[in-house]
Amino acid sequence: MKKILGFLFVIVILGCGGYFVYVNYIKSKVPKLNLEEEVSNASKYYVYGNHFNIEGNIDIKDKNYDSLCLTLYNGEDKDIEITSDTDGGKINYYISNLINDGLYLDNLDIGTYYLVLKATYSNNEDSEKPIIKYYGIKNDTKYKKTVYYTLSKYNNIITIDSNNEYNTLEFVVKKNNSKNKNYDVTIDPGHGGMDGGGASGNYKETDFTMDISKKVKSNLEKAGITVKLTHDEGDIDKNHVMDEYNKGGRAVIPNEVKSKYTFSIHINKSGSSKVKGIEVYTPSDINYDLAKDIVNNITSNTSLGYSSNRLYKKFDGIYTHNFTESEVKSAIDGYDEKNYKHYNVTTKSNYLYMIRETGGFMTGAYVDSSNPDKVGVNPYYDSNIGNESYLLELGYISNSTDVNTLKEEQDTLAKAISDSIIKEINEKM
């Protein structure tokens, strides 16, 4: 009996080992790809949220192609639509001009893929067999190697590199065998510790932000989504505030834990008790579908309405605030007054640090090591991987109607937010 059990054990081990070898090595081998002499140059590439985007150009002799696209080649072509135009003989192209659109990475099968430019030409001799030409993509950026961690459901690591026989961008997808836990979503309960946030009457912001954040977290986890809170009750001493930067800072945690989305939960305040309603703040140059869904879900299922605020408004309840020219000047003047070294703040920088500093260069992050002792350092400020981040102002603490909603409809409010996030993630899966 022991011999039989031992034999079965060996068979199981060999089977598992064989599958591991197949998945990680044999399956990853890709048939030879023939590339043309001309090479495309990639001037920018990044991953924002869970979408890959690239910008590049190429000068090819024969521009009479019928179609032009990118393709991920692994023995078969996985075509990716692009937008292109010709400028001075060169062809410029990009996947999307929206930072949270592009190639969705998480559902790529395990294996090795080569990203190339693909031109299709008519075949005068055989109309049924068009002529296909492939062009390698030279990585002209400073990001020579990028490592992306997928959603926990897939639990893969994607390494984007250009050190291969084709000298083109290569995507290697493997199982994530790391013991370090990564997260899908980061939720940041606004303020905390001695910083109670906005206050009015008997209430302050932190009377609501932590409870709502934890309820959203619970709802997401029930749906199989892993969630990291930037801080929990008791994490911040009542005589201290949470660091924004450095290791474990609230604007650094999202990239430390490799999350794809960040939601910062706040309650607004106005000098007028008549101002009320929700304001969802976003990055610029995005697809606003998720923001719209959050706003519509909240206004349809709770007593919170759209804010009457018109400043930085993009749509009902949705706002995008990048630094204006005057705000850039004011920031620089402020650095001089405090004797700080200047940061590279521009009109491409989002004004809200939880959106800006979690999004890498795509959202204009700038907190480098210029003032480490006074401000801290965001080690991911210049990263080409960033969280898709939103700041939710869930009504006004200075308005009695909104406060009553925050007290009486908190579960419904949390569900409205979490339902939108679940929908966003599941639709992409």
Task: Show where each model-derived region lies.
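Short glycine-rich His-centered loop
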Residues: 182-202
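Cell-wall polysaccharide-cleaving catalytic domain and substrate-binding groove, primarily
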Residues: 195-205, 388, 399-401
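N-terminal Sec-pathway targeting helices
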Residues: 1-13
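Hydrophobic beta-strand residues in large extracellular and virion-surface proteins
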Residues: 52-58, 68-72, 82, 91-95, ...
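Basic, ligand-binding patches in group-transfer machinery
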Residues: 18-175
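Active-site-proximal helix/loop segments of hydrolytic enzymes
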Residues: 210-429
